[in-house]
């Protein structure tokens, strides 16, 4: 009898708690709108994270979701001439292929339109701004994101976001921490509107050296620590070597490490070729990733796919895949299937093969 009474009391207490919770949720929804709070379950599932390809199949695989996540802040950093802007322009081109509106905030005043066009960027549809101050640049970014009509905003670069106080001051004046404070405020303002609008914001950043570091890496990025915390993905891009055709250097071997990833396991590393005037070499990746996935076989210096030999030496195999786009698409689809990614779009691939 006592057990039954205790059971009834627990039921009543649970019912009271549920009633109080329902009342609190109703009050929140009245005050802040429907959908401002919900249960993370089957009835109100959070949509899967939408991704935009980076233009590099290997990097898409390393990121775990097939590309860079929409509705998030991304940081791409590395030394000079490492391929930061090239990689970002490939992301812009891929987003435009999906019908998205892209904006490029060129704080460095260094964007080469012809190079962007070679990488597949539609210049007629690309919004570009060359702001005078860091405050102006970040205000433009905030307005574009809040509009809900822009899919991707690129800021090139954080180091060039000079605060107004520094521009108006004399050369040599010390403005301690002004850029870090500016970035910290911008991150706080941008985060909520980026999530609501599902707009991806990519910040390109440069590397600086910390003075007096005895242990650990002396490298750091500009603009303080706020961007490091707010970024969902941080990519460290480096030049790993040169690609030569006889004595002429035709491109760079590039290494990218995913140093932070909130949407998949981090610390994955990938290498791909960036060819001068062409961008990321897709056929080179197909050969390297094909060998790892067991799709392409390498015997000595010969490469083969199925029963067909596709070339002696890596450069000859790359040329064979350029000349046979159907085979390249078949290899790509098998690589994607082995990693659980969606199949590539044939039309986009033809365009890339032609560029390579």
Curated annotation (Swiss-Prot):
Residues noted as binding ATP in the record, renumbered to the chain: 78-85
Alphabetical keyword list: ATP-binding, Cytoplasm, DNA damage, DNA recombination, DNA repair, DNA-binding, Nucleotide-binding, SOS response
SMART domains listed in its UniProt record: AAA (SM00382)
SUPFAM superfamilies for this protein: P-loop containing nucleoside triphosphate hydrolases (SSF52540), RecA protein, C-terminal domain (SSF54752)
Compartments, record wording: Cytoplasm
Organism domain of life: Bacteria
BP-aspect Gene Ontology terms: DNA recombination; DNA repair; SOS response
Gene Ontology molecular function: any one: ATP binding
Family listed: Belongs to the RecA family.
Protein known as: Protein RecA
Organism expressing this protein natively: Paracoccus denitrificans
Gene name linked to the record: recA
């Amino acid at each position: 009898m006592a057990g039954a009474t205790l059971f009834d009391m627990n039921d009543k207490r649970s019912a009271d708690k549920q009633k109080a919770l329902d009342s609190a949720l109703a009050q929140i929804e009245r005050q802040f709108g429907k959908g401002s709070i919900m249960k993370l379950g089957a009835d109100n599932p959070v949509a899967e994270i939408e991704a935009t390809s980076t233009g590099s199949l290997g990097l898409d695989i390393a990121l775990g979701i097939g590309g860079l996540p929409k509705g998030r802040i991304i940081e791409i950093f590395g030394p000079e001439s490492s391929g930061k802007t090239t990689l970002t322009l490939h992301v812009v081109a891929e987003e435009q292929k999906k019908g998205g509106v892209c904006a490029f905030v060129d704080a460095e005043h260094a964007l080469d339109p012809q190079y962007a066009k070679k990488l597949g960027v539609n210049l007629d549809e690309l919004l570009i701004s060359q702001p005078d101050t860091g405050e102006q640049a970040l205000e433009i970014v905030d307005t574009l994101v809040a509009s809900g009509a822009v899919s991707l905003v690129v800021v090139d670069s954080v180091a060039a976001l000079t605060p107004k106080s520094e521009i108006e001051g004399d050369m040599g004046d010390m403005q301690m921490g002004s850029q870090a404070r500016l970035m910290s405020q911008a991150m706080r303002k941008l985060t909520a509107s980026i999530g609501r609008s599902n707009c991806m914001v990519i910040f390109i950043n440069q590397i600086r050296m910390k003075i007096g570091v005895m242990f650990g890496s002396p490298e750091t990025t500009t603009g303080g620590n706020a961007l490091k915390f707010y970024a969902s993905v941080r990519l460290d891009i480096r030049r790993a070597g040169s690609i030569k055709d006889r004595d002429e250097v035709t491109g760079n071997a590039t290494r990218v490490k995913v140093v932070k990833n909130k949407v998949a396991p981090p610390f994955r590393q990938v290498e791909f070729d960036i060819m001068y005037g062409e961008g990321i070499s897709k056929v080179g990746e197909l050969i390297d990733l094909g060998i790892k996935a067991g799709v392409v076989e390498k015997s000595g210096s010969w490469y083969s796919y199925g029963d067909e030999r596709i070339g002696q030496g890596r450069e000859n195999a790359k040329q064979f895949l350029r000349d046979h786009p159907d085979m390249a698409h078949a290899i790509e689809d098998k690589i994607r299937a082995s990693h659980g990614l969606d199949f590539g779009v044939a039309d986009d691939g033809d365009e890339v093969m032609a560029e390579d």
